[in-house]
Swiss-Prot record:
One Pfam short name: UPF0262
Protein name according to UniProt: UPF0262 protein RHOS4_22360
Family: Belongs to the UPF0262 family.
Source superkingdom: Bacteria
HAMAP family in the cross-refs: UPF0262
Disulphide linkage map: none
InterPro entries associated with the record: UCP032146 (IPR008321)
């Protein structure tokens, strides 16, 4: 079964996340574990590793790290992605999220809906960038990419 069965965020930031960011993290993890598609392609003449997988996301030396293990915690693989392609979309996503969280407190539903549509658009762009960056390393569907993008944002800014 090619899916993620456990996810861990290796958060080394000394600054605790805000309540909103922690909520986003918890929802993304819950949704990701409920339904996801995560497969590793065949590499170097070897058959593809079979899931389910345990995934740890971390930032080390300025790079996004995917540490992938079997359900029995045996190392399956690890790959690193440059954070450069994510910087602008993560920044945009957090700016629109701040606007959204403020809007929920004081604006009418029609204005909240407009901000939420923009937020979803930026979120979709982040998922698209992630899918592109994962090409040849891991295969994910768009919903899994969206949830992983949320966790990358939390890791990056949390």
């Amino acid at each position: 079964m090619n899916r993620i069965c456990h996810i861990e965020i290796d958060q080394t930031s000394p600054i605790p996340p805000t309540a909103e960011i922690e909520q986003e993290r918890q929802v993304a993890i819950f949704d990701l574990l409920e339904e996801n598609s995560f497969a590793l392609p065949a590499r170097e003449g070897r058959a593809p590793a079979e899931g389910p997988f345990r995934l740890t996301l971390a930032i080390r030396e300025g790079r996004l790290v995917f540490d992938i293990r079997s359900e029995e915690e045996e190392t399956v693989g690890e790959f690193h992605l440059s954070l450069g392609p994510f910087r602008q979309v993560v920044k945009d996503y957090f700016q629109i999220c701040e606007s959204y969280f403020e809007a929920v407190k004081r604006l009418p539903p029609s204005q909240i809906e407009a901000i939420d549509m923009a937020r979803r658009g930026i979120h979709n762009e982040g998922a698209r960038v992630l899918k592109e960056r994962l090409e040849g390393k891991a295969e994910v569907d768009i919903d899994t990419a969206r949830r992983l993008f949320t966790l990358i944002c939390v890791l990056h800014w949390g």
